[in-house]
């Protein structure tokens, strides 16, 4: 049977862990009570009380007598063992705050210090739970009211657009707004009268906007004026994210409802913008739907919070009764049940209301469909996945041993064949090997995050029912590696069987083509949600300045900075097959080309450039100067990478000095950011020396070892300036080994980066995502 302390640890919300009942602390206090209580002489107890300590032959008789006396006398005549008083607390400003509970002991326990300490801590835990629950409940209730207003606004907008569409289909000629005439008129030859009319109509539009804002309705980027390519002025009024052209005819409306209706009517009065408006409405609807899902999730977490804490109080009081030999739980639990976090039913009622609203507006009155959105069920771990992981791991090891034997027997690495083999096979197979290693490290990250209760799905904003799990990551990695080694074995067998080199050397290209087809396959096979999510993130990284940067975006950007050798191998592979060098076996066609050599700089710069642009975008959105400082880290890395490439081609003392200077500066920059910013370590004032106050791993030595390991792997670039004289095969293997070390370092870095982000969420009790709403209410926005 699982102990409740472990069950509580497994079920509690990680981000709210500090707000839960400290069950372990109370349990330790009960153990202290048990050890401190010793048998006392009978004279120390009140008349009529029998000691519970010691055994005798008369115990059954005494028990029967106590039972008979309990039935004989009414319970009202029994004195209370304890009394829990409730009072109003006060803040520093003197205002009343939450209710405070305080237990007063009477009779037996008034003389026992350990019992006093226990109930004092129990009161603290009860007050802590109430003080956390009430603000959270208020926050969710206010969020629910805002979402209902947003939904009403959305419904009215949809109705106006629908009515407008019906009028257009029926052939009725609706009156065009002033903004439509502005777009259709030629202002290059406009008269002063036309300009004055424009100004008067514009002022009327501004008056309507001001009137609406005075009554609490705000428009995002209201009354923004711009010019089209033809020089025609245009007014953009945004209620949502749409750039809809606005105008108004007549004076200010008599009421806010009328003004809103007039303004919305004008927003959709242009037939040309019907498609755009519907698209914007759909975008707003998607945001509101996501907000309702997050609200329901938050309410569910708060409900779980209440129930788990109630169970914890019940369990701990039963333990106390067992140790003390008294029935103190009934009195205290009555108070707990009357406290705010249990007695309030607002959360449950709001959950029911959200279910009905979501079913009606977003699921076509299909409750089953609605609950799939509100309560997505995560698929259970399949033993079949574990079986295939083991199967492919065994296949990979067997095929790799076969490959080594065949390579030795065929003499593929002799001086006559090694250049041909390395130029055709090494780049493509290295791509898959590095990718598989990265996937394996990511699987290790997922395993560690799960075991340490780090909520990575919330941090990365993954859907819980489609998020990749560690077994799936291991399956993908072992599948890739088995396929790669199988292709290498087939390549050697066909090469030794007398097939033409041009035919055999197409095998790596075929393998790469299969991988690309699997990646973009539209069918729901082989983890389609994960594949498409990966493609979307890559698109956002490539266009990083133009997209809002989320945690998962810059996390993936950091992964790319560790895969520059993989990108260089892709460059070589692309040139090799596009130039059809596999037919002529002229391997130096690419390497000696000027464009190929210059493209190497671009490939090495791109991951750092994308990451720097993400920092710029985050600085633009958040106005945090730390993002600009972080951008400097990637700029220094770009400089160091470019200097190293040049030094590999221009081997002289000048470039050696530049490599040393640029690499040392970049490494110090990166190490500081790794330890202080990304990991949150090296805090001299921390209670854990040179670490941080909160640690997920219990053994502090892991953090010190990780700091040392990251330091060693960060300076692996020193190999590039040592000028080892090795053969081409050894040189390629050394490059692959260093690239693998960087992938391992990145996987090691990933755990502590996400751990630090998780602890930031814990410190702010952030367990629910805040979805930005489409319609801005000035009063609610503050």
UniProtKB/Swiss-Prot annotation:
**Phenotype reported upon loss of the gene:** Strong reduction in plant size and biomass. Severe deficiency in shoot Pi level, but normal root Pi content.
Locate the region Important for inositol polyphosphate binding. 315-322
How is this protein situated with respect to the membrane? Multi-pass membrane protein
Q: Where is the SPX domain?
A: 2-334
What GO cellular component term, any one, is given?
A: plasma membrane
Which loops or segments lie on the Cytoplasmic side of the membrane, by the record? 1-386, 445-473, 528-593, 640-782
* Sequence ranges of Low complexity compositional bias: 170-188
* Primary localization class, coarse: Golgi
Expression triggers: Up-regulated by sucrose and Pi deficiency in roots. Down-regulated by auxin, cytokinin and abscisic acid (ABA). Up-regulated in leaves following treatment with ABA. Down-regulated by the transcription factors WRKY6 and WRKY42.
Q: Where is this region: Disordered?
A: 165-202
Identify a single GO molecular function assigned to this protein.
inositol hexakisphosphate binding
Q: What is the effect of changing residue 27 to A?
A: In PBC; decreased Pi content and reduced growth
The record's note on quaternary structure and interaction partners says: Interacts with PHO2.
* Additional free-text comment from the UniProt record: Pi content in shoot of pho1 mutant can be restored to wild-type levels after treatment with cytokinins.
Free-text domain note:
The EXS domain is essential for Pi efflux out of cells and is necessary for the endomembrane localization.
What is the protein's given name?
Answer: Phosphate transporter PHO1
Lineage of the species this protein comes from:
Eukaryota, Viridiplantae, Streptophyta, Embryophyta, Tracheophyta
